[in-house]
From Swiss-Prot:
A lipid is attached at S286 (GPI-anchor amidated serine). Residues 241-281 are annotated as: Disordered. Its main location: secreted. Residues 1-17 form the signal peptide. The keyword Secreted applies. It comes from the Eukaryota. Belongs to the IHD1 family. Residues 287-309 form a propeptide. This is Probable cell wall protein PGA50. One of its GO terms (cellular component) is side of membrane. The gene is PGA50.
């Protein structure tokens, strides 16, 4: 009888502790449907306008300075244009300074991303979001006015320290006569700077996808029109119709020869939904853990006292 009572009390305490833990570990971030205006002020609770969507919440990014040993900032977890989650509105320089479970991205430095913008199509100019860059003659063949012309391109080191080409209309390896085994970016996707997305974007591209050089030239001209009209942020010049992105930046895709551009809205929604779910799973609050330990600890102590009776 005594053993049955102890077992019953143990089960009751365990259920109560788990329930209390689940209530205490509710995610601190909340999903917002629109982007904010970037501000380096930590308490402003806004994200960089290069985000397609973002979460807003207390991510406990420690800022260390001479006056304050550690300050918890209100930060944005941003799903940015390169389909990678990163922290913004935070001065953290390394992943170790971010006290947030399982997110592998580090905080973006404010100064590295505040001037994010689409690149111009003027030769020899680089996007202002690059933290460092150099102009190089890539001998990138651009189809204009009925013939191919050589172009110059910028090799850019961006805030995440990935290298990529900008201001170049090359679409595959065969168009690039350069020692780097990378693909020149077409202008509409110059803002996509992740190597993972970069590689998968052209992974299924083949020159045979275009029926003729003329069709290729027309396609490039059409996409240049999108840049000029400000539509570049909504489309991708890809033959990939279905691309799945995970929160860590990896991706996979399938080819559809009839698809000339894919909208970013659906991909952004899917990815932000995935990141949201991941955030809800991973954002285990310290309060919830403490409540679990406290509840379970009291139950264990009670069982110990009863066992002595």
């Amino acid at each position: 009888m005594k053993l049955n009572l102890l077992l019953l009390l143990f089960i009751v305490e365990l259920v109560a502790a788990v329930t209390n833990y689940n209530l205490g570990s509710a995610p601190v971030s909340r999903y917002l449907s629109k982007t904010g205006t970037y501000s380096p002020v930590a308490a402003s609770r806004v994200c960089n306008d290069n985000c397609y969507s973002f979460y807003e919440g207390e991510l406990f990014c420690g800022k260390f300075d001479s006056n304050v040993s550690e300050t918890d900032y209100l930060n944005c977890l941003c799903l940015n244009k390169q389909y990678r989650s990163n922290f913004e509105g935070c001065n953290c320089k390394s992943e170790s300074e971010v006290n947030f479970f399982d997110w592998k991205s580090s905080c973006s430095d404010i100064s590295s991303v505040k001037n994010y913008s689409l690149p111009t199509t003027q030769l020899g100019t680089c996007n202002s979001h690059c933290s460092a860059y150099q102009t190089i003659p890539a001998e990138c063949l651009v189809y204009e006015s009925g013939k191919y012309q050589e172009d110059q391109v910028c090799i850019c080191q961006n805030a995440e320290f990935w290298y990529h080409y900008e201001n170049c209309d090359c679409l595959d390896f065969g168009d690039v006569d350069h020692e780097y085994e990378d693909i020149c970016y077409y202008a509409t996707n110059s803002f996509v700077t992740s190597d993972d997305y970069y590689d998968s974007f052209f992974a299924t591209y083949t020159e045979g996808s275009f029926e003729s050089i003329l069709e290729k030239g027309s396609f490039l001209a059409e996409q240049k029109g999108s840049i000029t009209s400000g539509l570049a942020s909504k489309t991708e010049t890809s033959k990939v119709s279905t691309t799945t992105f995970s929160s860590n930046g990896t991706s996979s895709g399938t080819t559809n020869g009839d698809t000339r551009a894919e909208t970013k809205s659906s991909n952004s929604t899917q990815t932000s939904s995935s990141d949201k779910n991941s955030s809800q799973i991973n954002s285990i609050s310290s309060t919830g853990v403490a409540n679990f330990v406290a509840s379970f600890g009291m139950g264990t102590l009670l069982l110990f006292v009863l066992s002595l009776c």
